[in-house]
């Protein structure tokens, strides 16, 4: 693992404002044509309890913008970021935007990591953002971890997606989307889902599929809002 040397620390300190400027440049030039389903956010916010925002890894760019709007409303949004030096710039950006940085651990087992996230949600009252098919895919396949976390904490899962009428698609496993300047953006938010306690492992699959289908439908709906049928 690479170490955080003084030279690398200086480089990251210099890069942070540049990256932040580029994010804000694109965010500020894009036009939000619709945010569909905000009543679900209002419903969750009224409980004053943590929740788990979920979206596809490729949607991270503009869903992060929406998370910033929730932070401005006073919601305690957390971002799970790699503990390696590669996570240093994302961590600094998340802090600048007012988010809570949750640094993972490369030495944690699955059970230990789940216990850590339980503490983040239940004891600290943080709503941890999840890219539910990440960090390595397969693309648009909802991972079981979010289902387990909702069951354990009783925090509702909140699915959301976005689409841009003009965008760059990176040649990565997730085809990461970066909207082009002045693109039209639609954000879609689905109904929250809390996974009941007391279910056996084999009973969780329907909930995983429900969230997977919800995100896929929200993705299609967002696309239809920025690419209306002729």
PLM feature spans:
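General small-molecule cofactor/ligand-binding pocket signal
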Residues: 33, 102, 188
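Non-catalytic C-terminal accessory region of glycerolipid acyltransferases
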Residues: 1-20, 25-30, 42, 96, ...
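Catalytic core of membrane glycerolipid acyltransferases/transacylases, capturing the structured
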Residues: 51-108
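Pre-Walker A (Motif I) flank of P-loop NTPase domains
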Residues: 47-54, 125-128
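Secondary-structure boundary motif
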Residues: 46, 69-72, 123
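Residues at the C-termini of beta-strands that transition into short coil/loop
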Residues: 36, 83, 105, 161, ...
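A short, well-structured juxtamembrane/interface segment
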Residues: 24-50, 62-63
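Short N-terminal amphipathic alpha-helix/helix-capping patch enriched in small hydrophobics
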Residues: 18, 37, 56-59
């Amino acid at each position: 693992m690479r170490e955080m040397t003084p030279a690398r620390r200086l480089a990251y300190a210099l890069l942070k404002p540049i990256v932040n400027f580029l994010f804000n440049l694109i965010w500020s030039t894009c036009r939000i044509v619709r945010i569909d389903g905000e009543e679900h956010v209002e419903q969750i916010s009224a409980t004053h309890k943590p929740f788990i925002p979920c979206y596809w890894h490729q949607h991270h760019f503009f869903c992060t913008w929406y998370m910033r709007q929730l932070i401005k409303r006073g919601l305690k949004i957390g971002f799970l970021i790699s503990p390696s030096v590669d996570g240093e710039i994302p961590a600094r950006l998340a802090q600048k935007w007012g988010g809570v940085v949750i640094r993972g651990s490369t030495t944690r087992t699955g059970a230990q990591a789940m216990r850590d996230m339980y503490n983040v949600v239940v004891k600290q009252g943080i709503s941890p953002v999840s890219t539910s098919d990440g960090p390595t895919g397969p693309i648009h396949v909802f991972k079981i971890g979010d289902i387990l976390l909702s069951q354990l904490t009783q925090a509702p899962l909140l699915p959301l997606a976005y689409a841009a009428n003009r965008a760059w698609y990176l040649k990565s496993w997730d085809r990461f989307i970066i909207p082009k300047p002045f693109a039209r953006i639609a954000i879609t938010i689905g109904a929250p889902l809390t996974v009941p306690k007391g279910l056996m492992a084999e009973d969780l699959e329907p909930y995983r599929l429900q969230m997977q289908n919800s995100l896929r439908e929200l993705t299609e709906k967002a696309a239809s809002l920025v690419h209306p049928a002729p």
